[in-house]
Every structure is written in structure tokens, then in C-alpha cells.
Amino acid sequence: MSQSSNITWHDSEVTKSDRQQQNGHKSVVIWFTGLSGSGKSTVSVELEKALFQLEKHSYRLDGDNVRHGLNKNLGFSPEDRKENIRRIGEVSKLLVDAGTIAITAFISPYRADRDEVREILEDGEFIEVYTECSVEACEQRDPKGLYKKARSGEIKEFTGISASYEAPHQPEITINTEHQSVEESVSTIIEYLKNKEII
């Protein structure tokens, strides 16, 4: 899909800094990545609640939810996965511009795609959170029954079974959900945000 040459970017009269000042905190993307069943959605839900309790403005974008609307025309081929992440990256950037903490929970299996999202944001605005968990543990949890379907061949291109997952080399935060509770994981992230003076 080619971009039209007849479009112009229109800057807002209200800047990102203005919005951040009004909200009382910086705006960033907290990007959860990890295998299905590794705890991305579970931890991100609790993180959003914790930030709300701290009176910080945040909004959570979940992989399944987004595929009901914005990305419902995308499948799970490598090309569609790439486009899925590109769109979420752009939406996240808009949320950051609005002075909000964007929380995203997507498998986002390809390192290059995550790095592309990092590149469209300013330095320090992309916080990669790796929910580290073995395939065996994720499969044992299997909250949606997806691993069972993948093993039986019912689901093709399933990350961790028939499609690859590229773990981050240097994520800002790693939470090992086999050994850390949800509460401990959320505390780790909140502590990071405070130490970096984001909140």
C-alpha cells in the first residue's frame, strides 16, 4: 500500500509536554512481549489498575481485543503479524503524544518489528517488558487451550510450537513469570517507572 504524496502533518497547538504537565507524569509505551500464556495480559491488566490507583493516565491495548476491531482483517502470517505490530506501534505513539502511558500486551514475536516501534518513539519512551516463561510452563497453563489446538494441528503458525519467537536481547525489564507473582511483577515495573522519574 503506497502513501499518498498529497497529505501534510498538522501539529497540535497543545504539545505532548503540555499534556504530560497536566497529567503529572511522562508518557511512555510499556510493551509486553512473550509467548502465549506467559502472563502478558494478566500482568498488564494489574499494572493498569495499579497506575489508576496512583492517579496516572494509562490505556491498555491487548492483542486479542485489537483483533476484534482495528486489526480484524489480519491473520497470523509473518506479513500480517508485522502489520499488526506496525499498527499497534502507531496507535501507541498517538497515546504517548496524548500524554498517556500506553500499555501493550502482544506476543510480537519478531525482534525487528519491536525495534521498529522503538524507532518511531523518542529515546526513553519505549519500555520493553519481557515476560520470560518456558514453552513447557506456558503450555501447562494454556488458559485459552491454544497449545492443545496447535499440537493437534488445528492452529497453524502458532508461536512457540510451529512459529518462532525471538526473545529480546536487552529489554528494559524482564519478569520471570514462572518465579515471580503477578504482584511482584507489577511492583518491579512500578519501581522502574519511579526510578526513571516517569511517574
UniProtKB/Swiss-Prot annotation:
Top-level taxon of the source organism: Bacteria
GO biological process: hydrogen sulfide biosynthetic process; sulfate assimilation
Region of interest: Disordered: 1-21
GO MF annotations in UniProt: adenylylsulfate kinase activity; ATP binding
Family of this protein: Belongs to the APS kinase family.
Its biological purpose: Catalyzes the synthesis of activated sulfate.
Identification of the protein by name: Adenylyl-sulfate kinase
Organism from which the protein derives: Staphylococcus haemolyticus (strain JCSC1435)
Organism phylogeny: Bacteria, Bacillati, Bacillota, Bacilli, Bacillales
